């Protein structure tokens, strides 16, 4: 049990604010997480190459910088998961303001965006959506958030790449879902109980 706990502490360090800490692409490119990342890559490669599940795509979350994007793509290729090979597509979660602001540069390394509107809104407005004090300010329809959403969508459309959105916003606000469609979004995730109203 002690050894298991040590490994857990290595891969899941305690942080004051894990939401902004060791997660996403930063974890994948870290030497401390390398064994786990390689194991995940082997599992994906086996599913695609040996089991014939070539419909499996890869999605990379929380990519902070363009250099981090480049590095994670390189590591995937080194582990036998090369973008474009055997139809492999690698999508990036667009959930940081920097992702929308530098969308064209990030898209050089990926086959499209899945926009994570929850994190994008939280980080754009600088608030904790789980806070009982400021969570009432959380709104994906805020003009600043919509400006970033528009930038990300238009960059994908311009590049001829996929763009979809996941997050609570379209389920809570049918007007936002309509606006997203007008902007050119390809897919929208919805809660089951909101499909008819949003449709």
Place the predicted regions along the sequence by residue:
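Conserved alpha/beta-domain cores
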Residues: 2-199
